[in-house]
Amino acid sequence: MIDWTTELIDEIDMNLLDGPFCKYVDIEGNSGLTVVAIIETSHIAMHVWDEASPALMQLDVYTCGPFKPILVFEKLRDFGLTKLEWKYLDRETKLKLEHIGQWENPAKGTGWESLREAQLPNHATLNNG
C-alpha cells in the first residue's frame, strides 16, 4: 500500500513531504489497514476494512491544490472495485458539499468508460467513502 500511495501522489502531481506510513490494526470488528501521507498541500489517508464482505475502502485526498479526480478513480482500478462513491467538498465555500457521485457496475472491473463520462469537477478535493 505504501508503493500504491506513492504512485497515486505522483500521478495526481502532488509533492510528498513525509510518509506514506502504513499500519495494520488487528482488532476484531474493526481490523484493517490505514495509510497516511503528508503532501505539500495537505494529506492523503486511506482506510481498508478487510472483515467486511466485500472489503470496504475509504480514501481521502484533501488538498488546497488542484488535481483531476478522474486520475484518482483510474488509480483505484488497481483494486478491482465494483462500486465507487465520492463527495466533492469545496474549501473555498467552507467545505460546502458541492458534488456527490456514484458509479456501480455489477461486472467487476468493467464499465469505467461511464465513470469517465460522469459529471466531475476539473479540480477537486475528493473524499471517496
Predicted region positions:
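Polybasic/polar functional segments that serve as interface/processing modules
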Residues: 1-129
